[in-house]
Structure formats: structure tokens, C-alpha cells
């Protein structure tokens, strides 16, 4: 109290309220309602009390962008090391060799996974990576039209539209056929001399592993082919580099990053070497120092904080360096064999849920192979009823694509963690609600 009075006297004031005299009383709150101070034990007890309101034991069939994957404990151990957890953007790379090496290894791993030449040091998330890819396509050819599949979610298109605002670019949708895959004839009819980029998804927004992506390179003309992929699926399906992609992007949350109220996320972005000078973000390179020893450096960082704004390729600031470490640790621990097993288990469980729900009259929307997100025909809304039975699932496609004609399309998502018992419980619940 003596300290408070001393400070007020120094300021020529008598009451702390005078500090806020320039704020109109009509907008000031008398109390913020958090009560008085508590000792450490009571604070922890109160936090635990609030935390117990969360339901953490529910069976999860939700996905469509964020997935419940197994994360090896070693990933969390590596992330918790203070030299990684506490470090910031390495503005002085010569004293940040450990962080730069981890980012370099990440770039190498993702390039291998995508089958592409180069990977940047990360984007904020998958959707923003797609937006940056569209801007990159514009820098490559200067055209204004972007073709996206009608299976793209509203949220994805919203972010894409926000990124291309100001470039006078326009978005046009192309058709997905009755088999759940790209209608190549419809796509071909919409490609013209003004087409800047063609976006393909694999799996697409309907959850389908799309074999028709292999035909896009033959009809794309001089448009940039941008692939939006599921990184786990690359354990078994062909990578973007093998079907002619110029740029490949993905959401990397599944690579060792837990679900946490929708974030933080990790944008993966890879591309052909010929486009490296038009790429956004940073690229970490390997060089030799003055003593002839290996040194990691920031090879390219053409953001507007470093060069003239008119010549910058992005405005990305602190990238997702810690999360690139999570992805590197996850991929290194799992290896190609482990990643393949995870992908195969996911496909096995998608087939399992199709078979089980079909047996109770809930039919898959497509006979084509699905990956994690499996779409069924189900007229009624079941999310609330399932939640009352401790099951999360039943997301409607119309919640993701507002103008879809498939009003009965309903998702149930599986991962390697989904087991037969969980699917049995889901089927039993759907039979009675």
C-alpha cells in the first residue's frame, strides 16, 4: 500500500481511478468479476475444477481437416526441450544452428514426402499455404482465373479469396463426377488462356482418393497445377510430384501436432525448383563457414521486412518453426514403414465403417475408395443425439459447403486410432436415434 501511495504522490494523484480519467465512465467496468486473490494451491484447484467440465473420453468420428492421430511420446519430449521451445525466429543464424538444422531437415523430409524439388520453411496452415500458392501462380504466369473443385469447403475458398484479393483474380469451380472424382471433361472445358492455376485435392472434400488427378497434367495447358493433399495418405498414394504438380500444399497438423481447439497448425508448401524465386516465406540452405565447416543459413527470405515491398513474395512473419520440428520428429520416428502402416490402417478402418454402417442401412455416398473422411447418406441430423451417447460425429456436408445439393451427405471420420469396438458403438447408437 505504501508503494501505491508513493507512486500516486509522484504522479500528483490521490486515487488510482485518476489514472483512467480519460476513459468515459459509460464504457468502464466497475468490476471484472474474478474475485479476490487466491493462494497457489487454490488457483490450481480452481483450474482443475474448470478443466473437469471438458469431456475427454468421447469416441471421436470428427475430422474434415483436424484429425486425432497417434503421436509418439518422443515427439513431445523433443518439442519440450527449452532450446527449441523458447527460441524465436533465428535472426542471427550463425548462433541458431540447431534451429536452422531442424528446419533444414524438415524441408528435406517434406520434399521427399511430396515428391517435389523444394520445400519452404513453413506456412501458417494448409489454407494459407493454398492462398500463397495461388499468389505464386499469379507471379508465374500473370493470369487471373483459378479453378477449384466443387468439393472445396467454404472455409478454404474464403481464405483463398482473401489471399488473392487485390490481384483481380477470380475463382471458378469445376465439377466432381458421380463417382466422387474429378470430371475431367468439365475441367478441360473451363481451362483457357486466362487460367492461372488449377487446384486439385487428394483426398478431396468428399473424402475420396481421386485417381483422375493423373489426367490433369495432360489438359492443364500452361496453368499452374496446385495439389492440396493429406500428408498421411502419402504413405500409400502417389505424391504430387508424380502427377505433374507445380506446387503442393497441405495441412501438417497430422504430423505430430495434437488437436487443440483448432490450432496451432502447420502449412506445408513444396514446389518445383524452377519456381523457387517466386516462392513465399523462407528457405533454409546448407553452406560452408569461414573455417570450412558446414553451416546452415537463410538462403532466401524475400518477405517485405527484408526487401522492397514491391518485390517481396510474402509478408509471412514468425513461421511455424516449432511445429516443423514436430513434423520432422514424427516423420523420423515413424519412418516410411510406419507412415505406410498408419495410412493402411486408416483405409482399413474406412472400409470397415462403410461395411458396418451399410449393414444397418446407412449407405456410403460413393463406392470409390475413401481415406479418413467417409461420407454417408443420412437424412436426419444426428450430431446432438450421438453426443448424448458420448460419440462425436455426424457432421453434415452442408455445414462445410453451404450450397451443396447433397443435403443428406453426412461424415464419419476414421484414423488409425479408430477400432472395431468404436465402430460397433457408433452403429448401435445410429440404430436407436
Curated annotation (Swiss-Prot):
Disulphide bond pairs: none
Enzyme kind, highest EC tier: oxidoreductase
GO biological process: glycine decarboxylation via glycine cleavage system; nucleoside metabolic process
One Pfam family, short name: GDC-P
Key words, A-Z: Oxidoreductase
Catalytic activity, EC: 1.4.4.2
Record field: catalytic activity: N(6)-[(R)-lipoyl]-L-lysyl-[glycine-cleavage complex H protein] + glycine + H(+) = N(6)-[(R)-S(8)-aminomethyldihydrolipoyl]-L-lysyl-[glycine-cleavage complex H protein] + CO2
Entry GO MF terms: glycine dehydrogenase (decarboxylating) activity
Keyword Nucleus on entry: no
Domain of life: Archaea
Family affiliation: Belongs to the GcvP family. N-terminal subunit subfamily.
NCBIfam families documented for this protein: PRK00451.1
Function: The glycine cleavage system catalyzes the degradation of glycine. The P protein binds the alpha-amino group of glycine through its pyridoxal phosphate cofactor; CO(2) is released and the remaining methylamine moiety is then transferred to the lipoamide cofactor of the H protein.
Known partners and oligomeric status: The glycine cleavage system is composed of four proteins: P, T, L and H. In this organism, the P 'protein' is a heterodimer of two subunits.
Record protein name field: Probable glycine dehydrogenase (decarboxylating) subunit 1
Natural source organism: Thermoplasma acidophilum (strain ATCC 25905 / DSM 1728 / JCM 9062 / NBRC 15155 / AMRC-C165)
Taxonomic classification: Archaea, Methanobacteriati, Thermoplasmatota, Thermoplasmata, Thermoplasmatales
Gene: gcvPA
